[in-house]
């Protein structure tokens, strides 16, 4: 199954057609936090998505934060649509207009990493996704 998900990667919030959450991310390393809400498990580490807000990053590819927030947004959108957690995803990514032309190719490569499928857990549900187009 292949689906299209539009994601606006804003400085303040991550937005899809059916959800919006603050663009904050807290890392707990290898220690599971007290909450399951917004909990992302990826690469052996725990992150809480939507907690607070990050400082504005002119280049959103300098660390993994926006990649991890993208995985959370995909999981939330799949859950809202009632779709299976194993699928191929085409992302329609939104960037700020001021940097769209400059950052588009770099952001596309950033999201389309070579490790496919992407396996992770979000709020206790296991996902196995192939990101096939940005």
Residue ranges and their predicted role:
Residues 1-132:
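Nucleotide/phosphate-binding catalytic cleft detector across ATP-hydrolyzing
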